[in-house]
Amino acid sequence: MKAGIHPDYAEITATCTCGNVIKINSTVGKDLHLDVCGACHPFYTGTQKVMDTGGRIDKFNKRFGALGKK
């Protein structure tokens, strides 16, 4: 490998919204904030829940909710 052309590889912290903290190695260089992780993802936990990111469902229903009603 050539010297001086590869990015730095360091340990960073990935923090999920559920509070789970994961230490990983990455070239990103800064801490990550995750929406879902293996501890809270519905596929891994076996639970189903609606994940409304930023009120998108409410915004959609407000714009197009009247079209479904006759």
Curated annotation (Swiss-Prot):
Transmembrane segments: none annotated. It comes from the Bacteria. Zn(2+) binds at residues 16, 18, 37, 40. GO terms for biological process: translation. GO terms for molecular function: metal ion binding; rRNA binding; structural constituent of ribosome. The keyword Repressor does not apply. Belongs to the bacterial ribosomal protein bL31 family. Type A subfamily. Part of the 50S ribosomal subunit. Binds the 23S rRNA. This is Large ribosomal subunit protein bL31. It comes from Shewanella pealeana (strain ATCC 700345 / ANG-SQ1).
